[in-house]
């Protein structure tokens, strides 16, 4: 990965899996990383892996969280991997309700964060 020194990066959904890996990779490349997730202990452990990682325990689906963190950190890079954990079963066994929880949560997070990021940029 190229040098990302000084390129503040917010990773929503950073406590595990892909989000955690992305946060670590960006921090190793020199980016100041703000790792956001609902899981405090997992974020605390992540922060011990790099001095470039600071954490925010918060729900990425909350619109006030998105606006507040975008305003506070003014990231150049925004990575959204937060979302609802899906009910794992074959599609033909999903109900509208089980499918909708994931879809609504994931779309809401993307819409909220990207909308706020674009509004903030447009206001400058």
Language-model-detected regions and their locations in the chain:
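Conserved Rossmann-fold cofactor-binding substructure of NAD(P)-dependent oxidoreductases
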Residues: 61-74
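Conserved NAD(P)H cofactor-binding loop of Rossmann-fold oxidoreductase domains
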Residues: 81-88
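Flexible N-terminal pre-Rossmann segment of NAD(P)-dependent oxidoreductases
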Residues: 1-10
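Rossmann-fold cofactor-recognition segment
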Residues: 49-63
């Amino acid at each position: 990965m190229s040098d990302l020194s000084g390129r503040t990066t917010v990773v929503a959904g950073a406590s595990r899996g892909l989000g955690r890996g992305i946060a670590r990779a960006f921090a190793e490349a020199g980016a100041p990383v703000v790792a956001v997730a609902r899981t405090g202990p997992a974020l605390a452990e992540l922060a011990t892996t790099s001095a470039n990682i600071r954490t925010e325990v918060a729900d990425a689906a909350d619109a006030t969280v998105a606006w507040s963190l975008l305003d506070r950190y003014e990231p150049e890079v925004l990575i959204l991997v937060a979302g609802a954990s899906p009910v794992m079963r074959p599609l033909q066994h999903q109900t509208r309700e089980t499918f909708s929880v994931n879809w609504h949560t994931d779309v809401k997070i993307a819409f909220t964060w990207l909308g706020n990021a674009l509004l903030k940029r447009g206001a400058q």
